[in-house]
Amino acid sequence: MIRTVTGYIEKNSALGKTTPPLQREGMIVERLKYVIWAADMDRAVEFYCRVFGGTVLRQNQVISEVSVANGVIGIHGGGEGTRTWTGLNFQVPDVIAGAAEIVAAGGLLLREPQPEDNEPPHLAMCADPDGNEIMLTRRRTH
């Protein structure tokens, strides 16, 4: 599927430019972040803000987001204070559809999206064709 980047059209039309719109293939990605785990959420958020000059975008005991240099670090609560997996996370509107696109493009589905807390699925674990793990998430309501 090819999508036109409409913001590009609106911006350039306002400037009087007639450049054709950008087109790209692929799923809609709402946010890209790198996710880590923390045993102590407050300590982790304070660390990334103090050491790297981060700005808190969202914070609770389940998931917090800290912006650093136009990137986002997702800090997931429930870590055990030891080295754990971290990973590239694409926030998409629909993890089931996103996982299907990854599989159709030669990737793998490592963990089926499951409903949780009376909400639609919010997580799919996938891998690219080279085996690199990718998380697809949907923004949760809480």
Predicted regions and their residues:
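Short secondary-structure junctions
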Residues: 53-59, 108-113
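Terminal peptide-recognition signature
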Residues: 48
